Amino acid sequence: MFIITAKCSKLRVVKILLIFALLLSLFLALRACRHSSPPPVIAAGTNEERIAYLASLGWEVNDQPIETLSVTLGETLEEPYLSYNDLQRSQGFDLTRYCGQTLSRYTYVVTNYPDASLPCQADLYVCDGVLAAGDIVCTGENGFMAGLAFPAG
């Protein structure tokens, strides 16, 4: 049987305990920050809820979607949804929560995009009546995809 002894002053023991407590506090604080903001829960199960949500962001759209389709995500995100999820995370959504599930995509014609020369659409992805993701797509020569926030300016 081995017995190991170490001689430490009380001051050294206190320093070690303080460092340990500081590291534990830092770990718990970082963990709490990472999980402190739950994803937004935005009701989008009905056409009226979807249009009202878009209107709350400043968008005016036609009263019916021009396209509705089902999208089934894989068990893990792969391209193009992996890159698309970066856009979603920037606006508070996260498609990884919906891996393995089927989402409905509703596409609306945007009627008030600031640059009226660009035809634009709003895509909303809904799962179980809750908004899972969304984007604004402007097509044409200089087309692009952006988040749902109304452009400033």
Which residue stretches match the model-derived regions?
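Second-shell loop/turn segments in exported
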Residues: 37-42, 109-113, 121-122, 136-138
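N-terminal Lys/Arg-rich, disordered targeting/topogenic segments
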Residues: 1-10
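Ser/Thr/Pro/Gly-rich low-complexity linker/stalk segments immediately outside membranes or between
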Residues: 4, 33-47
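Mature extracytoplasmic domains of secretory-pathway proteins
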Residues: 56-117
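A short, surface-exposed interaction/processing loop segment used at functional sites
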Residues: 117-153
